[in-house]
UniProtKB/Swiss-Prot annotation:
Keywords: Ribonucleoprotein, Ribosomal protein
GO molecular function, one term: structural constituent of ribosome
Physiological role: Involved in the binding of tRNA to the ribosomes.
Family stated for the protein in its record: Belongs to the universal ribosomal protein uS10 family.
Any one GO biological process: translation
S-S bridge residues: none
Protein name per its UniProtKB record: Small ribosomal subunit protein uS10
A single GO cellular-component term on record: ribonucleoprotein complex
Self-association and partners: Part of the 30S ribosomal subunit.
Stored InterPro entries: Ribosomal_uS10 (IPR001848), Ribosomal_uS10_CS (IPR018268), Ribosomal_uS10_dom (IPR027486), Ribosomal_uS10_dom_sf (IPR036838)
Length: 102
């Protein structure tokens, strides 16, 4: 598995939960002897929704809601078999979406 790269992309609505998951992944990778590049913060996607307050008329009265999606990128360079096994066994929080590319 030499001269390979594992790219891990994490997404979450809560940035604190995301940072905890990132530190767990980085610590696990460093413990098994792999080099780690990152975490690299990617741009936060902000989705804004505008909703009418009242059920009938009065379009001037509105509420605005937003959802922020935070993203991080981690590159694991020269992973060993122990690194891959440790990452597979790692239990991350439920609110974090993980995408892995080899």
């Amino acid at each position: 598995m030499q001269s390979q790269k594992i790219r891990i992309r994490l997404k979450a609505y809560d940035h604190k939960l995301l940072d905890v998951s990132v530190t767990e992944i980085v610590d696990t990778a460093k413990r098994t002897g792999a080099r780690v590049a990152g975490p690299i913060p990617l741009p936060t996607v902000i989705n804004k929704y505008c909703v009418l307050r009242g059920p009938h008329v009065d379009k001037k009265s509105r509420d605005q809601f937003e959802i922020r999606t935070h993203k991080r990128l981690i590159d694991i360079l020269d992973p060993t078999q122990q690194t891959v096994d440790a990452l597979m066994k790692l239990d991350l929080a439920a609110g974090v979406d993980v995408e892995i590319k080899l």
